[in-house]
Amino acid sequence: MVLVKKYFLQRSMTKVMVDEYLAKQFYNAEYAGVEIVKTPIGTRVIIYAGRPALIIGKGGKTIKQLAQMLERYFGLDNPQITVTSVENPELNARVMAFRLAIALEKGYHFRRAAFITIRRIMNAGALGAEVIISGKLTSERAKYEKLKEGVVYKSGAFLDKIVDRAVAIAMLKPGVYGVEILITKPMKSVDKIELREQPKGPGENMVTVTNVSFIEESQKSGEQK
């Protein structure tokens, strides 16, 4: 039993180490995540990115070097690497965090870049988005700026399935800027309330609301007469 636990623990640690390495190595490629699947003939590695061409490289040179690196330093047996694009990058917190960090490094104003990021996320259909940028934004003293739109859940059941969270860093002359993005996915949540449409037929399942005070005044005037 101990060996089984050790095996799964070691496999999880390897995935985390590979994920951190790929995030640093392919920062500009808008790296989104990785899946590692053990097969009878080797190890299948699926890399998700917003710009897959930067990971593949010219003539597949970069991906061949990456396969050698994964086998030598991370112990992956005969890695077969597949690079695929993210289906909806605007709803992937990691992709948007890297995009925002790259924009800050290019010289965009932090508030303008954050507004553009939130607008793109909401236009993609997200229920909510939150962007937090921290660092020496306007002075020598570090502070943070938070922008939020829509509904962003911070606790509750199935939080990891409803909200996508990612962090990134941007290296600037004043220092290091931290970027954190939270995206509420476009899915039905537990606290969502839907109102039924008004029935087409007249008088069908309809409730008429009458002004009660008007009825009481009419009754009093009738009694006085």
UniProtKB/Swiss-Prot annotation:
NCBIfam families: PRK04191.1 (NF003219), uS3_euk_arch (TIGR01008). One of its GO terms (biological process) is translation. PROSITE patterns: KH_TYPE_2, RIBOSOMAL_S3. Keywords: Ribonucleoprotein, Ribosomal protein, RNA-binding, rRNA-binding. Residues 18-87 form the KH type-2 domain. Part of the 30S ribosomal subunit. Binds the lower part of the 30S subunit head. Belongs to the universal ribosomal protein uS3 family. This is Small ribosomal subunit protein uS3. One of its GO terms (cellular component) is cytosolic small ribosomal subunit. The keyword Transmembrane helix does not apply. Transmembrane segments: none annotated. GO terms for molecular function: rRNA binding; structural constituent of ribosome. It comes from the Archaea.
